[in-house]
Amino acid sequence: MISTLIGIRMSLLARAAIASSIVLLACGATNVLAQATAADPGFLEHDAVTPPLLFREVWQQPPHTGPLNDENRRITPQALTNPDLELKLYGPDAANIQVTSHNGIPDLWNGFTTSPVALTLKHKGAYLDLTGLTRMRWRTRTENLHVLHPIVKLADGTLLVGSQTFESPQRRMAGSQRFTGNFVVSEVTFDDQRWFELDPDKVVVKLEVNNPDLSRVDEIGYVDLMPGGGHGTAGCTNVSWIEVYAAARKR
């Protein structure tokens, strides 16, 4: 009886010792990992933070005479509200981009364009450094197979289109068999996509450009590589506003 109790006690003590050893080893491993993380920047997911907001652009209806018809809705430089920016248009029919409004928010609409079109914003006082954790944030809507791509114009004049695409979730309209896209807010990243040269006159995609220098970008914007489909819920895109989070570089 006594020997049995002694055996049980010794077994329990052995198990307790093993458990304590496991805890000590786990704590030691955690401390080693913590020390290595603090000493080795390779353990960090990112070595930088997202740059602050450099500029924001919301559109406005340009001045016009007469009724606000389709012709008077056409975009002009006066559609910009940010005095630090310049408007640049690309494509044979880019002048037919229009300033419209949905739910009280102005947006740019390309439903009447008969060619692919692109639009960029140029900061008058600075190049944009789009390396690292730079972001472009925007509110957009697409209809019927249309998608938006980000574009940049480098300091050397090369116009590039990125491989990222942006399209809206489509929902059925109430009481109709037609679908329409939702306005969504999304972010463009620049260090994780492929880049292709974009013909500034025809707005067609050319050859891929490997490792472009995004540290000095002259213009930033978007392109729709399809012509517009007209009024209603035909193929088109809307862009309500654009925010750019990037570092400024002296021109």
Identify the function of each model-found stretch:
Residues 16-31:
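Bacterial N-terminal signal peptides
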Residues 1-14:
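N-terminal secretory signal peptides that target proteins for export/translocation
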Residues 7, 16-17, 46-47:
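Compositionally biased, low-complexity segments
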Residues 10-12, 27, 136:
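Short, amphipathic alpha-helical segments
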